Amino acid sequence: KAYAATKGITVVEATVSNVNDIQQAATNLVNQDVQAIYTPTDNVLASAMANLAQITDAAKIPVFAADEGMTMTGGVATYSVDYYQLGYQTGLMAAKVLAGEAKIADLAIETQKEIKLTVNEERAKKLGITIPEALRKDMK
């Protein structure tokens, strides 16, 4: 919230505990005139992205999801980990352990060097959002 405030963005929070809460939470956000919605990676939200999109699309509010799957089922865009690359990177670490080159306890924590931009172009077009050419080169 503090970082968003430095960028002139006011964060409005909504909490859901189960799929049945999605419609009410989304409607409340729409009624507060939010300009966009961000959804973190969450199984409840992931299973209800189509429901969320139905409400937000009608209000022309874009949803930015935390992962590719959620983006393709109701979001507009995301910068997220590439799960294939993450698995590959984990496999390399496991290979070191299996080959006796390292002990699990001694392996450093690794993060992905590159993240993946995924855009749901159909939804962006539906909402009247133009994807800048500068971003198109990074799209997957």
Please place each PLM-identified region on the residue numbering.
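Short hydrophobic alpha-helices and adjacent helix-cap/hinge residues
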Residues: 1-140
